[in-house]
Amino acid sequence: RLRSRGLGDVYKRQMYTVIKRMEVSAAHSLKLSYRSKCENLHGHNWIITVYCRSKELNADGMVVDFSHIKQVVKEQLDHHNLNEVLSFNPTAENIARWICDQIPTCFKVEVQESESNIAVYEED
């Protein structure tokens, strides 16, 4: 309910959030300071969840077009060896931050490489 505050005050505090979830199949090997089977090339069916927010909508009435998020993530990562397309050690944490950096309205990314392993990057 709107009380004694004017509509302008209410809209100033509102935030739009969109969430895009997609699956990406990709391979990688990790460069680690300790021995691990993850140093060998292996793959995941990653579940990537991208969170975007904005106080205002763009000219098309969106925070960001869902297809833009999909394009950025899928074209760069899907069915690739991540060591060949990314310039950093492709840990789930690093991938989450990289995705967040690619999308201007993004503030949080979850990278799930298995049922029990999820990395989250979130900006303040």
Locations of regions flagged by a protein language model:
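Single conserved hydrophobic/aromatic residue that forms the stacking wall/gate
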Residues: 1-14
